[in-house]
């Protein structure tokens, strides 16, 4: 990949005799920060030294801390640091800074050959206007996968005949979860309705947005920062029937901060979450002081709706280049293109379950021959993630005003209600009601309609 002479800009305006400094702010921590800093050092001692570019990188803590610091700089607040040349950002933050006139459009700096190297859906995330602009440079992405406590799954599968193929669709997943609840309930015949949940989800907004896309509906249709809402009644009812309903019945659950926490406590044995969460999957189930056992992990592609369209979520922050001198923008691109070349991008990405962003790098063969130490378990995770990227349309909503708050409604409206209503069902059963009596009001059409209208009204506030 050519590193000098970005796109149509022939004279970069920097050299060893006329050097340029580039500042980068990230939210990276731990191993990811160490990997990034090591690559920055490598760049500075090689390509940077040859071309007169010095990159200075600093971590600003969490994603929220970084967002706050960037906004303070953009607004010129007292005590704020000068704007960096590059910062890590998700689309909504990048859009807010773009509205303030702070973001460089990189489309003029990238040739057709440059663009063709990247997975197209990753580049389009930063095209806020739909005009072909590039205001977010992709650096590392993750995919959603289905993670299983393989040890306890094998006991269940041996007893019931359940297979991994049963988990390929969302409808199949719900059916398996029902069988798991009934199988565990039957183990204590003297105690009715004490079956255990099978499944949970880490990111409900992803389920709502991607599930709707699979069903032919784009909930947030954004253009030029304005959103048109398509909260299709039938599609949303399907989403409800395949999350809220099994949750009320005890087949799904969510109690810890993350679903990997629920696997650790034995609350569930499967969840859909980011490929980058693989490193947090527990190696033991510790249900209580008297019940603990070692487990292994299985990673599969995330289930999709039967007969639905092939959509999967694309997620992971990119790098945003701020407006500056032409030399600084071009130098920023030299670093970012070097960083996303397969050799370096694979080094940065794979240890933490992230994926390279180019067609060449996003190949399990390229990852395997990279020379990096890759455990069998991480190989399985990355194989499933690479297949997800290569076999689906990748989707994330375009940024729009209030997008973060609108997404939060999708994240919590159904899941919070499911948790509260399941708790009410359990309390009613503890008071002597049958499950049918305790759950009747929650499994009614009227319950869905009331929630649907409330959620629709909340989302309509973000239209236009």
What are the residue ranges of the model-derived segments?
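Short, polar/charged alpha-helical segment
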Residues: 30-54, 95
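Short, solvent-exposed loop/beta-turn-alpha elements that line the ligand-binding surface or hinge
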Residues: 107-118, 162-166, 191-192, 197-199, ...
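Extracytoplasmic/periplasmic solute-binding protein
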Residues: 129-144, 171-228
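Glycine-centered hinge/linker elements that transmit conformational signals in sensory
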Residues: 174-181, 222-256, 298, 302
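Hinge/lid segment of periplasmic solute-binding proteins
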Residues: 88-145, 189-191, 292-303
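Extracytoplasmic/periplasmic substrate-recognition and gating elements
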Residues: 75, 249, 287-361
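Conserved C-terminal helix/tail region of periplasmic/extracytoplasmic solute-binding proteins
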Residues: 383-464
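Extracytoplasmic "Venus flytrap"/periplasmic binding protein-like
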Residues: 48-121, 155-156, 269-270, 288-291
